[in-house]
A protein has these predicted regions:
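Transmembrane beta-barrel architecture of outer-membrane proteins
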Residues: 244, 327, 349-351, 360-362, ...
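Extended, compositionally biased low-complexity polar/Lys-Gly-rich tracts
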Residues: 247, 251, 397-408
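Exposed, low-structure sequence patches enriched in small/polar residues
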Residues: 326-328, 334, 395-397, 408-430
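A general secondary-structure boundary signal
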Residues: 63, 340-341, 397, 404, ...
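Solvent-exposed loop segments that connect transmembrane elements
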Residues: 388-390
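Secondary-structure transition/capping motifs at alpha-helix termini
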Residues: 254-256, 368-374, 385, 405-415, ...
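Structural preference for beta-rich elements and adjacent junctions enriched in aromatics
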Residues: 2-369, 374-378
Length: 430
């Protein structure tokens, strides 16, 4: 079909109250511009979609609304592998949206729903090269209605959960749909077969009817109280021992694109456990970070170097050879300063546990977008131990470094250059 032009979709504000029920009874949906020219992405990327899909968008002061009518050409049952939240998109019938609110081709958000109404949301980092990070969770709303020849999904995504720069007149966006009953996948903006469907450089444009306004600052506080009791019956009946804990997290939107995360005595008991893997190699396994405090903008800290050589790996904080080290507290500021600059600052303090002394971790990262789709970044890290007298001046590790990530706009060419230097007490004072 040759080179495909970037598709555009206009979005208009509504004063109508929209009920999320999957029925699209509100008249506003009849007046929306429709995105309905979809292309195949699976099994080939050279054809138009066989099954029709209509997508409409609108918004009010609080929510971005998206509705999709997914028509069926096959009356067989839907293919759905799991009813678990954050299901695997490639192996399920589903509709998904990918949003790049900064128009920087680098960071964004994804929301998906399958015909059974199961939700999936995640962060898109590094331009979508690695798909969607589903450890990120927010509250949003969706409903599905199934008919004989189609199924309809209706979404309401709160602006308070999205990071964006006010005043922008367009976002980048893409819609995709899996119709696995006929073994096909579609996208509104064509994505070449050899790229991930979440790749942001291939998104279309969402044109706002007026520059999007600044939203109210969002503040979320999540406290917890825990308690436990244990009693030994052997070798003798002893009195029970009680323990208690309290703490919490806070998420404060400094601006619409800059967020402050705070944590005190964090409790990660609700975090999904890692899958069990038998490691027969001589190298350590790298499991993804699932603790919410570290998730958003995690690529700003963790994407330096490459997979086997990372100067910063957040999973090491709070763990020592598999043993849990209690985290006293931490603060984390991360996000966008403007379209081209990103900043990240983090400080975490862990308590003494066994032979492991108190530790303080500080990370600072700065990233600049260059050459339209490339980035140059700088990072500085410091780990310092504490003893009974305070900072242990002879037990520290420090790293400074820079990375240059090169990507052409069409993603045909990519490369990476980095230099990191580590400093230890023995090396400086020998």
């Amino acid at each position: 079909m040759g080179q495909k032009a970037t598709p555009k979709l206009n979005i208009y504000q509504t004063e109508t109250k929209i009920k999320i029920d999957g029925e699209l009874n509100e008249t506003v949906w009849q007046n929306c511009d429709v995105a309905n020219q979809f292309y195949q992405s699976v099994p080939v990327d050279t054809s138009y979609a066989k099954s029709k899909t209509d997508v409409m968008t609108t918004y009010d002061n609080k929510y971005l609304y998206i509705a999709a009518v997914c028509y069926d050409t096959n009356s067989q049952p839907f293919i759905i592998q799991s009813l678990k939240r954050d299901f695997s998109y490639p192996i399920s019938d589903a509709f998904a949206v990918y949003i790049d609110p900064y128009d920087d081709h680098t960071n964004g958000f994804s929301f998906a729903v399958n015909p059974k109404g199961v939700q999936r949301e995640g962060l898109i980092q590094v331009g979508g090269n690695y798909g969607v990070t589903t450890a990120w969770d927010i509250l949003w709303f969706s409903e599905v209605k199934i008919y004989n020849d189609r199924w309809i999904v209706e979404m309401a995504i709160p602006f308070s959960s999205l990071r964006f720069n006010p005043g922008m007149e367009k976002w980048r966006i893409n819609f995709s749909r899996n119709d696995l009953k006929i073994n096909e996948g579609y996208s509104w903006a064509a994505v070449p077969r050899n790229f991930n469907i979440a790749s942001l450089p291939f998104c279309g444009e969402l044109i706002w009817d007026k520059p999007i306004r600044k939203r109210k600052k969002s503040v979320a506080i999540i406290p917890y109280i825990s308690g436990s009791s244990q009693k030994k019956y052997q070798p003798k009946n002893e009195s029970p021992e009680f323990s208690q804990g309290f703490g919490g997290d806070a998420r404060i939107g400094i601006t619409n694109s800059l967020q402050l995360d705070l944590t005190i005595n964090p409790d990660f008991s609700q975090v999904e456990v890692d899958r069990q893997v038998t490691n027969l190699s001589r190298f350590s396994l790298y499991f993804p970070e699932r603790r919410n405090f570290f998730i958003e903008n995690s690529d700003l800290f963790s994407d330096f170097g490459f997979r086997q050589i990372r100067p910063f790996f957040s999973r090491k904080i709070g763990l020592n050879n598999g043993n849990i080290i209690p985290i006293v507290g931490g603060a984390r500021l991360s996000g966008k300063l403007n379209k081209d600059w990103r900043i990240g600052l983090m400080n975490i303090h862990t308590n003494k546990s066994g032979n492991t002394p108190q530790q303080n971790y500080t990370v600072a990262a700065l990233q600049r977008r260059v050459l339209k789709n490339s980035t140059i970044g700088f990072i500085g890290l410091n780990r310092n131990s504490f003893d009974s007298s305070g900072i242990n001046q002879s037990d520290y590790n420090r790293i400074i470094g820079t990375d240059f990530n090169f990507n052409t706009l069409d993603r045909k060419w990519a490369g990476k250059f980095f230099y990191h230097q580590s400093f230890k007490y023995r090396e400086i004072h020998q």
